[in-house]
Amino acid sequence: MGYRKLGRTSDQRKAMLRDLATSLIVNERIETTEARAKELRKIVEKLITLGKRGDLHARRQAATVLRRVEILNEDETTQFAIQKLFTDIAPRYTERQGGYTRTMKVGPRRGDGSEMVIIELV
């Protein structure tokens, strides 16, 4: 099986994964279901690899996935999620060849018993 359908149509699934990828880049740690985290991991690994490349084409490819979200930094300046990926996150992993994310099981969700995990950047 190449991918999970996650109970959605293709455009809904793509939009959800874009939102999750942007949230993970901005917050560096999110809680989601296990199936979503496994699909999200594929996308984020590719984004960080693009960030490590750092050229204009890689930046444009990453911009097709990430949403245009402004982030307020500690020093009162703002930057976009794409800038954070290329300036803050990608330089951390110059020596690492893949494996940029970690998932930790949290337990079942109270409402429907779905297995929840925390996915974070290593």
UniProtKB/Swiss-Prot annotation:
GO terms for molecular function: structural constituent of ribosome. It comes from the Bacteria. One of its GO terms (cellular component) is cytosolic large ribosomal subunit. InterPro entries: Ribosomal_bL17, Ribosomal_bL17_CS, Ribosomal_bL17_sf. Keywords: Ribonucleoprotein, Ribosomal protein. PANTHER family: LARGE RIBOSOMAL SUBUNIT PROTEIN BL17M (PTHR14413:SF16), RIBOSOMAL PROTEIN L17 (PTHR14413). Part of the 50S ribosomal subunit. Contacts protein L32. NCBIfam families: L17 (TIGR00059). This is Large ribosomal subunit protein bL17. It comes from Macrococcus caseolyticus (strain JCSC5402) (Macrococcoides caseolyticum). The gene is rplQ.
